[in-house]
Amino acid sequence: ETGFSLVCRRAEHMQNAAEARDTAMAAVLKLTPDAVIALCADFAEVYPVNFNCPGQITVSAAAEQMPAFLAAVKAAGGRAIPLKVRGGFHSPFMAEAATSFAADLAAAKLNAPAIPVYANRTAQPYGADVVGMLAGQIDHPVLWEDSVRAMIAAGAATFLELGPGRTLCGLIAKTDASVRTFAAEKAEDFEKLMQEVTPC
């Protein structure tokens, strides 16, 4: 119940922040992280926010700056795909949402994880500051590729994606094709997988 309530509060805060400013997101393909970071630096309010897998980075931007950024990506030899979202997530545009969510988390009195849980903000296991890390993920970049590589380096060889779709399985496969990925959209799918998958 506490977890579900926090998920709802997080969504509310992010929605409020998204409505406060006209922002947008786009996926940048075929460019290196350094190239995308350099392009973003040429704009006052364009930020690299999701480092998904090799050759795929998402940016958040002030809506009025996005057209020029898309043109810059094309000129640099990359490809940019505008995303159908209403908000510049995982960026400074979400700073107020992060602050508000931190208060909710503090009130919930969370404990540190009993097993290693990797934070996408740092690509490292959570430490003692669970509140700061969870809140900070709202307005900081998602280091998904680095997180996957860190888990593989720590010994993970099998990844399970729970929920609709196989997006994360695809990103993991593009990051390291040697690991196994499985997706379970329904409870019965998960139960079947647990019978078939050998633990890492």
Can you name each region flagged by the protein language model?
Residues 106-200:
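Acyltransferase/transacylase module recognition
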